[in-house]
Amino acid sequence: MNHLQQRQLFLENLLVGVNNTFHQMQKHSVNTCCQSLQKILDHLILLQTIHSPAFRLDRMQLRQMQTLACLWIHQHNHGHQAMLGAIKWISPLIKELK
């Protein structure tokens, strides 16, 4: 596993951890939880598009997807399956853009 793959796996695991933390904290605010999700997804997108020849356009498209993914996860009460679905939704497209 190369460095980029390790970093992607780390970020995906971090996203799982953020969702687990959300479930454990009843008083966790919507704003804070979504900011955390956005930051992790943003790092994942940045990591995967940094070497892409059209990385600015790729990032714009992926950031729109990131917002939708965050809303999807939140609407499904931060369910594990919803979060994994969002990662799978973004990740295959990231690999195609390279």
Curated annotation (Swiss-Prot):
It comes from the Viruses. Interacts with NSP2 and NSP5. Belongs to the rotavirus A NSP6 family. It is found in: Host cytoplasm; Host mitochondrion. One of its GO terms (cellular component) is host cell mitochondrion. The keyword Coiled coil does not apply. Keywords: Host cytoplasm, Host mitochondrion. This is Non-structural protein 6.
